[in-house]
Swiss-Prot record:
A GO term, aspect molecular function: structural constituent of ribosome
NCBIfam families associated with the record: PRK04203.1
Purpose of the protein: Binds directly to 23S rRNA. Probably involved in E site tRNA release.
Any Gene Ontology CC annotation: large ribosomal subunit
Pfam family, one: Ribosomal_L1
InterPro entries: Ribosomal_uL1, Ribosomal_uL1-like, Ribosomal_uL1/biogenesis, Ribosomal_uL1_3-a/b-sand, Ribosomal_uL1_arc
Species assigned in the record: Methanopyrus kandleri (strain AV19 / DSM 6324 / JCM 9639 / NBRC 100938)
GO biological processes: regulation of translation; translation
Name the record gives this protein: Large ribosomal subunit protein uL1
Length: 214
């Protein structure tokens, strides 16, 4: 059995309309329980990024480790920028490095700074699955940052469960359903038996109750 956008719309409508109002814009999340995977085999652990058709619905924190023109463009695009000097300061301040790792969803680094990024931030970014992606000198850092604002991380850790964002509460259920389907298609494409390995699917707002889809 597969899930369609139509299957998702009503559960999404319920979680958006009936969850108690909050003082902040909640995200809408999807929880996918998978069966028949051997997590001791790294090749069976899903770790992907999915560009959502309608975006995340709210900004995401992006950190760029760079200098010069790339740093300037990244800052203008709204990213947090760490230069070489700040990076070396973080080498002596693990607490601050961990705080930066927690607060940011995506990390990019000027390619020639990657060895230093690995040395200083690798220990805090690696376990979180957030290791910085190298950016060559001719790359459009603005485009990468813009893409990050439309991207969901789809990652399976120590349990056969994927918990990911599919949008924000102020989005239409139909938009959220399209985003959810993009994520589900990516997940099932990584599974040997595709939809047969999907055990259950739930949707919820950040602080609201979960609604079962499948």
């Amino acid at each position: 059995m597969t899930i369609t956008e139509e299957d998702l719309i009503e559960p999404l409508r319920k979680v958006v309309e009936y969850s108690p109002p909050r003082r902040f814009l909640e995200t809408v999340d999807m929880i996918v329980n998978v069966k028949g995977v051997d997590l001791s085999d790294p090749s069976q652990r899903i770790d992907k990024e999915v560009v959502l058709p309608h975006g995340r619905g709210k900004p995401v924190n992006v950190c760029v480790i760079a200098e010069g023109e790339m740093a300037r463009e990244a800052e203008e695009a709204g990213a947090t920028v760490i230069n070489r000097e700040k990076l070396e300061e973080l080498a002596e301040n693990v607490r601050e490095a961990k705080k930066i790792a927690r607060r940011h969803e995506f990390f990019y680094a000027q390619v020639d700074l990657m060895p230093d990024v690995g040395r200083v931030l690798g220990p805090v970014l690696g376990p979180r699955g957030k290791m910085a992606k190298p950016v060559p000198p001719n790359a459009d850092i603005r485009a990468l940052i813009e893409r990050a604002h439309r991207t969901a991380r789809v990652r399976m850790r120590d349990q056969p469960v994927i918990h990911t964002v599919i949008g924000a509460r102020n989005m239409e259920p139909e938009q959220l359903a399209e985003n959810a389907m993009a994520v589900l298609r990516e997940i099932t494409s990584e599974l040997e038996k595709s939809w047969a390995q999907i055990d259950s699917v739930y949707v919820k707002t950040t602080m609201g109750p979960a609604e079962r889809v499948y």
